[in-house]
Amino acid sequence: MATAREIPLNRTRNIGIMAHIDAGKTTTTERVLYYTGVSHKMGEVHEGSAVMDWMEQEQERGITITSAATTCYWLGMDQQYPKHRINIIDTPGHVDFTIEVERSLRVLDGAVAVFCSVGGVEPQSETVWRQANRYHVPRLGFVNKMDRAGANFLRVVNQVKDRLNANPIPIQLPIGAEEDFKGVIDLIRKKAIYWNEADRGRTYELADIPEDMKAEVQKWREKMIEAAAESSEELMDRYLEAGDLSPEQIRQGLRQRTLANEIVPILCGSAFKNKGVQALLDAVIDYLPSPTDVPAIRGEEDDGSEGSRSASDDEPFAALAFKIASDPFVGTLTFFRVYSGILKSGDSVYNPIKGKKERIGRLLQMHSNSREEIKEVRAGDIAAAVGLKTVTTGDTICNQQNIITLEKMDFPEPVISVAIEPKTKADQEKMGVALGKLAQEDPSFRVHTDEESAQTIIEGMGELHLEIIVDRMRREFNVEANVGKPRVAYRETIRRSVEQQGKYIRQTGGRGQYGDVWLRIEPREPGAGFEFENAIVGGVVPREYIPAVEKGVREQMENGIRAGYPVVDVKVTIFEGSYHDVDSSEMAFKIAGSMAFKEGASKADPVLLEPIMKVEVVTPEEYMGDVVGDLNRRRGMIQGMDESPAGKIVDVEVPLAEMFGYATDLRSLSQGRATYTMEFLKYAEAPSNIAEAIIKQQS
């Protein structure tokens, strides 16, 4: 049996705070750290000192880039709970960093979605919400900034329902709004809560519900109780009998339905004004899952069968690395989430994806950017290890006697690339090291050398993503670099099926070369990727040469068909061929495979694909005509329009190639008043005139 734990697993919460850029997520996290007694002076993003935003660029830009993991403890607003441990993973809200969000969601058990009471559900919230649905993460909603002009709690609740297709259940109502926002009504306790300004909301008073709100409170309280009662027949019977449920029963019913992802309890407040975050912490304990409430994590056992690890100290150790960060003091930090078992510093672990064994040096628990060294971590913990050499994001680390590979994370392909060159000879060597480290930290960032031009090319998820990489290179590694113009990551594919022979024969003195294959090349659904099938019967091409044929095809796919861009979404089947006892070799079959693909693909109606971005522009009405006209000029397809307090919202799909420098153009079109967000949506066929121009340029 494992030794006793300081805090039982069912009193642990691993949560993320997700939000749109300006919903106030960082301030909310800050307040959480303040009330849980970790940070003594509250950081404000406006002053650029927030505890969670520990990379310099974040402090300058006021947006959160890296998900730092922080541990804190909470006993409840009235000290009504035994001690709970809450691990918070901060997730970025900016669209170029959806990869970070994806990583955090992967290791969370629950999440708090922060919405701005004025802006409501913004496009970024929708993206993150969809990601959270994919990982089945139970969530709470917190409508923040209730003190701002234009604040409207119920409008946001309706947007959560309409835009996110969720089932929001308010468990609080605000008392007043804008500058009259005074506190909240706790619908479960039927009391008004007013936090004391004097001690920054550390204490509060309970009072009766204001007269003018009683009818409204009654209406929303009934909705909440009905939602709780639907969790079980037993509660429903009790509710139908008595017409009410006790606070314990309400919480029990709401918890059950939140964990099942059937409802989203909604709270409100103003983190900046120190109101409501304390009750939000209580809700995290009341409604979000502990590691024992979520299904056991699945994976692949060493023998290839499906396995799982449940959250317990007694199971073999298994953890998932979800973030790598370079730290100026200790070197590489690997953040990981422990799913099962116990790990002590000094233990050896196995990385099944790389097939390597490593020894764990120091173990650290983070509080934003200060750290505490710990001796061991247990199931459900989130910590960082120092000095792991081979582990990259998404890798499993586990006990060597009980090997399991936890499901890998999927990372999106980069859509934009730029050439980068060092300014001086001295920067040359440092640049390679710096880019290597940054690529290890961030799987959505890639580096390669262009064979023809010998330039170093960096690829990423958007202009901002690459700007920040170049910026970090300058600050953290002192490398000055010149950056070329951004280039779009086009792809190629085919539209019809063909069958093609590839025959490679060289009869020179001594041993010759002989490889002969017939390939069927077929288009696949967009996004389906590459598939290679061996349909050879009767051994007309021996088994050992098949991988060489596939390799030849893959290499040729990288070189493109017409424009030199990678080929995607094709299925290649080898169905016929011949070989020579003496002269056949892997080399010959690789060349034959590559010849057949090159020849065949060029007859299969090849087309050029370009990345299409989902763009949402928010603009004051008076600039609407100019903004839409400009988007049409950029080959934009308008998908819809909507109203919001911030102005008109235009949803549009635009080719990435037309979006370079858009930020500057939009600023001048709207005198700086319009804003936009952009994320990758899909690859689509480029119109023939555009494709021809690109092919010409490439050749």
Curated annotation (Swiss-Prot):
<dbReference type="InterPro" id="IPR035647">
    <property type="entry name" value="EFG_III/V"/>
</dbReference>
<keyword id="KW-0251">Elongation factor</keyword>
<dbReference type="GO" id="GO:0003746">
    <property type="term" value="F:translation elongation factor activity"/>
</dbReference>
<dbReference type="InterPro" id="IPR020568">
    <property type="entry name" value="Ribosomal_Su5_D2-typ_SF"/>
</dbReference>
<feature type="binding site">
    <location>
        <begin position="90"/>
        <end position="94"/>
    </location>
    <ligand>
        <name>GTP</name>
    </ligand>
</feature>
<dbReference type="InterPro" id="IPR009000">
    <property type="entry name" value="Transl_B-barrel_sf"/>
</dbReference>
<dbReference type="InterPro" id="IPR000795">
    <property type="entry name" value="T_Tr_GTP-bd_dom"/>
</dbReference>
<dbReference type="Pfam" id="PF03144">
    <property type="entry name" value="GTP_EFTU_D2"/>
</dbReference>
<dbReference type="InterPro" id="IPR000640">
    <property type="entry name" value="EFG_V-like"/>
</dbReference>
<dbReference type="GO" id="GO:0005525">
    <property type="term" value="F:GTP binding"/>
</dbReference>
<keyword id="KW-0547">Nucleotide-binding</keyword>
<keyword id="KW-0648">Protein biosynthesis</keyword>
<keyword id="KW-0342">GTP-binding</keyword>
<feature type="binding site">
    <location>
        <begin position="144"/>
        <end position="147"/>
    </location>
    <ligand>
        <name>GTP</name>
    </ligand>
</feature>
<dbReference type="Pfam" id="PF03764">
    <property type="entry name" value="EFG_IV"/>
</dbReference>
<feature type="region of interest" description="Disordered">
    <location>
        <begin position="292"/>
        <end position="312"/>
    </location>
</feature>
<dbReference type="InterPro" id="IPR004161">
    <property type="entry name" value="EFTu-like_2"/>
</dbReference>
<comment type="similarity">
    <text>Belongs to the TRAFAC class translation factor GTPase superfamily. Classic translation factor GTPase family. EF-G/EF-2 subfamily.</text>
</comment>
<dbReference type="Pfam" id="PF00679">
    <property type="entry name" value="EFG_C"/>
</dbReference>
<dbReference type="InterPro" id="IPR005517">
    <property type="entry name" value="Transl_elong_EFG/EF2_IV"/>
</dbReference>
<dbReference type="InterPro" id="IPR047872">
    <property type="entry name" value="EFG_IV"/>
</dbReference>
<dbReference type="Pfam" id="PF00009">
    <property type="entry name" value="GTP_EFTU"/>
</dbReference>
<protein>
    <recommendedName>
        <fullName>Elongation factor G</fullName>
    </recommendedName>
</protein>
<dbReference type="GO" id="GO:0097216">
    <property type="term" value="F:guanosine tetraphosphate binding"/>
</dbReference>
<dbReference type="InterPro" id="IPR031157">
    <property type="entry name" value="G_TR_CS"/>
</dbReference>
<dbReference type="Pfam" id="PF14492">
    <property type="entry name" value="EFG_III"/>
</dbReference>
<keyword id="KW-0963">Cytoplasm</keyword>
<dbReference type="InterPro" id="IPR005225">
    <property type="entry name" value="Small_GTP-bd"/>
</dbReference>
<comment type="function">
    <text>Catalyzes the GTP-dependent ribosomal translocation step during translation elongation. During this step, the ribosome changes from the pre-translocational (PRE) to the post-translocational (POST) state as the newly formed A-site-bound peptidyl-tRNA and P-site-bound deacylated tRNA move to the P and E sites, respectively. Catalyzes the coordinated movement of the two tRNA molecules, the mRNA and conformational changes in the ribosome.</text>
</comment>
<dbReference type="InterPro" id="IPR035649">
    <property type="entry name" value="EFG_V"/>
</dbReference>
<dbReference type="InterPro" id="IPR014721">
    <property type="entry name" value="Ribsml_uS5_D2-typ_fold_subgr"/>
</dbReference>
<dbReference type="InterPro" id="IPR027417">
    <property type="entry name" value="P-loop_NTPase"/>
</dbReference>
<dbReference type="GO" id="GO:0005737">
    <property type="term" value="C:cytoplasm"/>
</dbReference>
<dbReference type="GO" id="GO:0003924">
    <property type="term" value="F:GTPase activity"/>
</dbReference>
<feature type="domain" description="tr-type G">
    <location>
        <begin position="10"/>
        <end position="292"/>
    </location>
</feature>
<dbReference type="GO" id="GO:0032790">
    <property type="term" value="P:ribosome disassembly"/>
</dbReference>
<dbReference type="InterPro" id="IPR041095">
    <property type="entry name" value="EFG_II"/>
</dbReference>
<dbReference type="InterPro" id="IPR009022">
    <property type="entry name" value="EFG_III"/>
</dbReference>
<feature type="binding site">
    <location>
        <begin position="19"/>
        <end position="26"/>
    </location>
    <ligand>
        <name>GTP</name>
    </ligand>
</feature>
<dbReference type="InterPro" id="IPR004540">
    <property type="entry name" value="Transl_elong_EFG/EF2"/>
</dbReference>
